[in-house]
C-alpha cells in the first residue's frame, strides 16, 4: 500500500516526464494501459528516453505511446528470469540492469534480449561507470570482460552486543 501511495504522490507532483531522447508526457499509467501490475517498484529512463517500470509481475517499457511487458518465459534463456523487478538502472550505453528477487539481469537494447548476470540474493544495484551490487556486507563490481562480479569492498566492522 505504501508503494501505491508513493506512486500516487509522484504522479501528482510531476505533470510530465521529460527525457533526453524524446518528450514523453503522461498523467498516469494503469493496467488498462498495459502495465503488467499496478504496484511499481522502480522506474528508470534510458538514453533513448524510454521509461522502464519494474513491478512484481515483470518489466514494462513505455515509449510514450505503448507499454510492452517482459515476463519470465519458461525454457527461453533470452527472457526475463524472474518476474519481480525491484530496481532498475543502466549504463547509458545500451544496457539496462535489473535487480530481481532472484538475482541480477541485463537487458540489451540492441538485441532486445535478457541475460542473467547473477542468480541468488542481492540487496542492491548501482551504476556509476560500472555496475555494483551489494550482498550483505560486501560490494561487488561487474567485470564485463570476464562476466564475473569481483569483490570490491568487504565490511570488516562487527558490532557486538554489550555484555
Label the model's feature ranges.
Residues 1-160:
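Carboxylate-rich, polar loop motifs that coordinate divalent cations or form catalytic acidic clusters
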Amino acid at each position: 500500500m505504501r508503494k501505491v501511495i508513493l506512486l500516487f504522490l509522484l504522479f501528482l507532483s510531476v505533470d510530465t516526464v521529460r527525457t533526453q531522447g524524446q518528450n514523453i508526457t503522461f498523467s498516469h499509467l494503469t493496467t488498462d494501459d498495459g502495465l503488467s501490475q499496478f504496484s511499481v517498484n522502480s522506474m528508470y529512463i534510458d538514453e533513448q528516453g524510454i521509461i522502464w517500470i519494474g513491478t512484481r509481475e515483470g518489466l514494462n517499457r513505455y515509449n510514450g505511446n505503448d507499454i510492452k511487458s517482459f515476463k519470465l518465459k519458461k525454457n527461453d534463456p533470452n527472457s526475463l528470469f524472474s518476474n519481480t523487478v525491484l530496481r532498475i538502472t543502466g549504463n547509458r550505453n545500451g544496457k539496462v540492469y535489473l535487480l530481481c528477487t532472484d538475482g541480477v539481469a541485463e537487458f540489451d537494447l540492441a538485441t532486445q534480449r535478457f541475460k542473467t548476470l547473477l542468480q541468488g540474493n542481492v540487496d542492491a544495484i548501482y551504476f556509476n561507470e560500472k555496475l555494483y551490487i551489494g550482498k550483505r556486507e560486501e560490494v561487488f563490481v561487474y567485470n564485463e570482460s570476464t562476466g564475473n562480479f569481483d569483490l570490491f569492498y568487504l565490511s570488516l566492522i562487527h558490532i557486538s552486543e554489550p555484555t
